[in-house]
Regions:
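Flexible mid-to-C-terminal extensions adjoining Fe-S/redox cofactors in radical SAM and related proteins
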Residues: 1-2, 245, 251-344
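Small disulfide-bonded, cysteine-rich extracellular recognition modules and tandem repeats
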Residues: 24, 122, 233, 313-316
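Conserved alpha-helical substructure of the radical SAM core
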Residues: 1-106, 320-324, 330-344
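Processing junctions and N-termini across compartments
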Residues: 8, 12-15, 224, 303-307
Length: 344
């Protein structure tokens, strides 16, 4: 077994309030550094995974410099996913020690429009200019970076323009991702239909033909494979939330639209658990997930929506049962008619 990536939600604190944010927790917290070091040290037996630092806004972690040093002192590579607002702080940390910059594979920047108007409508005033300022800094320091766009009804018309902008400013990669529905996005008609998801995926394939850099569709895209195995299910990606808990995947632990739904996606509290024990529990959960999915397929309840693997997973864990309150929502039919829930 070889784990290729470990994702850490360093904090759920953020300086922005994006319209499409799926993080519903009102309490803020930061990943404990001692637990971070324990995980990094114990993970070496599984190879030398790449470390991904996310949030919230990971640059707001008060001990970011210590965290980066733990990573590089253990000879891991890493990248940071950021909204671009605090990059001067990151650059100062990187410039203080050569290995911090050497082991950094790149910066992933969230972009939600090709224009200031569209981007700032989703992320707030001043966000686009801060993002472009960070791009200028990255280029001046010859640092690799990628753009990540979460596609929704507000920016749907700018998919191609985002690719042109990304290519023009020298990004190394561009990732398109489907948006996770929330009660806020449902109420404001930001969510796309399953048919529009497929149109987005087809458009991304077209865009790949004219850009100078690599263009990718993130996890969650349609697949004809009912037993599709994502990076979680192949055990190539580990994810920890800001509470130092091993979670089933990165899209689940902060997605709390309905607090009454049990947190069945939480595998282990790493404050109290060694990594080996946590991974053993993770393996058991993956086995149960696949077993339940096979039973679900055999039951004849499979729908067209289930071909989107992240949708199926959110449905399995009861994360989108709230859609029953939005009967006209394009993704609500499955929840109203059969309401798959995780087995207790």
């Amino acid at each position: 077994m070889s784990i290729s990536e470990i994702s850490f939600e360093l904090t759920n604190a953020c300086n922005l309030k994006c319209l499409h944010c799926l993080r519903q927790t009102i309490d803020s917290g930061h990943f404990p550094v001692d637990v971070f070091e324990k995980i990094i040290t114990q993970a070496k037996v599984y190879g030398t995974p790449h470390i991904i630092l996310t949030g919230g806004e990971p640059t707001l972690h008060p001990r970011l410099k210590e965290i980066i040093d733990i990573i590089v002192d253990n000879d891991y590579t890493y990248n940071i996913v950021t909204n671009g607002w605090h990059f001067e702080r990151v650059l100062e940390i990187l410039n203080q020690r050569l290995k911090r910059k050497k082991n950094l594979t790149g910066i992933s920047l969230s972009i939600d429009g090709a224009t200031e108007e569209t981007h700032d409508k989703i992320r707030g005033p001043g966000s686009f200019r801060e993002l472009m300022k960070t791009v200028s800094i990255l280029k001046a320091h010859h640092m690799r970076f990628a753009f990540l766009i979460t596609v929704n009804r507000i920016n749907l018309h700018e998919l191609e323009d985002v690719a042109k902008l990304s290519s023009a400013v020298g990004a190394n990669y561009l990732f398109y991702a489907h948006m996770v529905p929330t009660q806020k996005t449902a109420a404001t008609d930001m969510d796309l239909t399953p048919e529009e998801y497929r149109m987005v995926e087809a458009k991304v394939e077209e865009i790949k033909n004219f850009t100078k850099h690599e263009v990718l569709m993130s996890m969650g895209a349609y697949t004809p494979l009912k037993m599709f195995q994502c990076r979680t299910l192949t055990m190539s990606n580990l994810n920890f939330d800001y509470k130092a808990r091993l979670t089933f995947c990165c899209l689940l632990s902060g997605y709390r639209e309905d607090p009454s739904v049990p947190e069945a996606e939480i595998i282990a509290d790493m404050r109290e658990t060694d990594l080996d024990e946590g991974i053993a529990l993770w393996m058991e959960r993956i086995y149960q997930f696949n077993k339940d999915k096979l039973e679900y397929i055999r039951s004849g309840n499979w729908t067209e929506h289930d071909y989107f693997p992240c949708f199926y997973c959110k449905k399995y864990f009861g994360k989108i049962n709230w859609l029953s309150r939005f009967p006209n929502h394009p993704w609500a039919k499955d929840i109203i008619t059969e309401g798959l829930r995780i087995k207790s």
